[in-house]
């Protein structure tokens, strides 16, 4: 299960098709382009809205090849022979694989790449977006700022590649909607605080660890080995008492750990969903949160009940998409479900071979697999 909360951040719908455009329908402000709903599976892209391949898998997919979801600009990050590049919605290389690492394109049409230990931002033509190079570069956020590293320090750049906040921090998070970003500037003490848009300390660096502020004005932080929640003045709204804590979701619940188990607390620090779970993710806009118990993972509703039964080895967040990736417990192969837990498309093993099945459990790849299987 992915842990969305990390020291340095690199990186919905309840029904399946209605909000996604047909491939031939122009995207509008309310209708996203069709390729945003495509699912990368077995080296190809499956379109749930049409229940058909948008881009068919290759005849022979290599194990280390990767195909990532399409960005809004119609380009998808892809890996071939150990190098990253970008393909278009026909599956053709728009930017040939040449990078050691890379990110998907952001909404400002820029992507972060690294080659020969040097990081640059490129445009949709694969050209360098600006002259400045970096030790490490990350995706642009909705605030049009990106975290970038110069030597061993981090700062923020704008969409023109200029330093908005000079690189002087040893660790840093993206800015939260309230305009504050968790940061640490001293490698000796590793104390965390919060900076404002000018890079000045809004909340002094005096915490062992600090997380992002949520819409309710609270942020998780730790002191004395325990986690609690700060208000926007840096005071404890919920005193440190948890083994771990994560930012609040939009529904007002934050996951927290006690005695090695995870549950969910409200803004007063009271348990709303008791600590039953071995692993837990944040609640999403569709009201679901991934969780794991006794070795199996599923999705909880806001009452703490299993909305989608714990039946998978691993589950991933929906991330505002109409589908989520899961790992099947019987085969350890990936599959994709909707917010009701129904299969959209999945890999399976038949006759000793890996195949792709649709929602009706029909083999859709390889196309002539059934006849070949019958002969064995």
Residue ranges and their predicted role:
Residues 1-4:
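Positively charged n-region of N-terminal signal peptides that target proteins for export
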Residues 7-15:
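Bacterial N-terminal signal peptides
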Residues 15-16, 351:
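Residues in and immediately flanking transmembrane alpha helices
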Residues 17-21:
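Sec/Tat signal peptide C-region and signal peptidase I cleavage site
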Residues 22-376:
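Residue-level detector of conserved, function-critical positions
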